[in-house]
A protein has these predicted regions:
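Sequence-pattern detector for short linear motifs
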Residues: 5-6, 13, 76, 161
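Bacterial N-terminal signal peptides
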Residues: 10-20
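N-terminal capping/linker segments that flank leucine-rich repeat
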Residues: 2-4, 8, 22-73
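Concave beta-strand-loop units of leucine-rich repeat
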Residues: 30-33, 50-62, 77-88, 96-113, ...
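Serine/threonine-rich, low-complexity intrinsically disordered segments
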Residues: 6, 16, 172-173
């Protein structure tokens, strides 16, 4: 019996460990400030697949300072980061440049004061977006098409491997137009 167990261990367990098995990653949808606070109160920093933060209409506003606390809890995002309806979010800086989002896709939807997309200017991390790049109804977001804004925003992105959708944003700093 001992010989059989030893053989099973060599055939099944050792290759399992040697192949660098990676456990499934968690995905999270956080609806509102209380769920965000509960999530960020956790002490384990982890890699997540998808992370969605939603400020439901009519709910308590989520302060940007609370959103940025995600960096203490999330080490890396390998799927999609979705930020939806966040009435206080003004910047990507301090969030996607701190969390490793180099393999992630992004959805920013209905964020009325989001304007600073400067974290995407990091060409090493974000020249290729490994998923969707969707910005919808974020009227203060600028494309970086203006000369003064050329090295900022998301003008360094060269490829989007998923869906690309830009609606209701400002096209250039010197000529505000909606696209």
């Amino acid at each position: 019996m001992k010989k059989i167990c030893s053989s099973i261990f060599r055939v099944l367990v050792i290759p399992y460990v040697m192949c660098g098995f990676v456990a499934a990653q968690n995905s999270y949808t956080l609806n509102g400030l209380s769920e965000l606070k509960e999530f960020t109160a956790g002490s384990v920093e982890e890699t997540v697949e998808n992370l969605t933060l939603i400020e439901p209409e009519g709910s308590e506003m989520i302060p940007e300072s609370e959103i940025l606390k995600l960096t203490d809890r999330v080490k890396k995002i390998t799927g999609t980061l979705t930020m939806e309806g966040l009435s206080q979010l003004t910047t990507t800086t301090g969030l996607i440049d701190v969390i490793d989002c180099s393999e992630a896709g992004f959805v920013f939807r209905d964020c009325p004061v989001l304007s600073n997309m400067y974290a995407f200017a990091d060409e090493d991390k974000f020249s290729v977006i490994h998923g969707d790049f969707i910005i919808e109804n974020c009227p203060r977001v600028m494309t970086g098409a203006a000369t003064a804004h050329l090295d900022k925003s998301f003008s360094k992105i060269r490829e989007v491997q998923g869906d690309l959708k830009l609606t209701d944003i400002t096209t250039a700093m010197n000529k505000p137009q909606k696209i």
